[in-house]
Amino acid sequence: MVLNPRGFGAGTIRRATAFDDPWLRETGAEVYAAFGDFRSILPSWLHHPGVLTFVEEDKHHEPRGFILLGFYEPSDMPPVTYVADLLAIAVAPAHQNKGIGTRLLSYAVDLATTAGLRTAVSEMRLTVAHTNVGALKLFARHGFEVLDNHHGAYDGGQRAIRMRRRFRRST
C-alpha cells in the first residue's frame, strides 16, 4: 500500500481486490461510455495474470479512481524487451479535476520505471481518444509522445492515438 504518493491530497493507492470488481466495472463503464462497451472489455483485463490493477481511495476507503497496467513483449521491439501498457486510467466523475488522475498516472509511471530498472521494461505505452484533450495534455506533461496518430478507432468512432514514454536504462 502506498500512502499519499507524490504529496497529492489525502488518500491511498492500493492493489485492487475481487471486492473492487463491481465498482471498477461500473466506474469504467460510466467514464468510458462514449468510447464503447467498457463493461464487456474490463473483466478480461481484471483477471489477466499480466495486468495489475490499482485503486485510489480517500481516507474513508471510498474508491475514486483506478489504473490498469499490463506488461507484454511487443512484436516491434527486440526479443526480451517488455512494454508497460496503461490499459485504463479512470476517475469517478464526482472526483474528476481534483488531481486524482495526475496522481494515478504518476503512480503508474513510477511503478513502470521501477520495473524497468530491474527488468527489460523499456517504455510505457497508452492509447487515448483524439477527443480527450485533457488526457492528451496530462500525458504530454508526463513525458508521453505520440507514437501513432491513427492507431485505429474506438467503438464510439473516436480516432485512437498511441503514445509512449521511454525509460532511461542504467548501464
Name every feature range the model reports, one short phrase each.
Residues 104, 132-135:
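Conserved short alpha-helix immediately C-terminal to the canonical SAM/SAH-binding motif I
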Residues 44-48, 131, 153-157:
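A short beta-turn/loop motif at secondary-structure boundaries
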Residues 2-11, 15-96, 102-118, 166-168:
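Acetyl-CoA-dependent GNAT
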Residues 98, 102, 150-151, 157, ...:
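Acyl-donor (CoA/ACP) binding surface of acyl/acetyltransferases
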Residues 125-128, 140, 145-162:
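Conserved catalytic-core motifs of GNAT/GCN5-like acyltransferases
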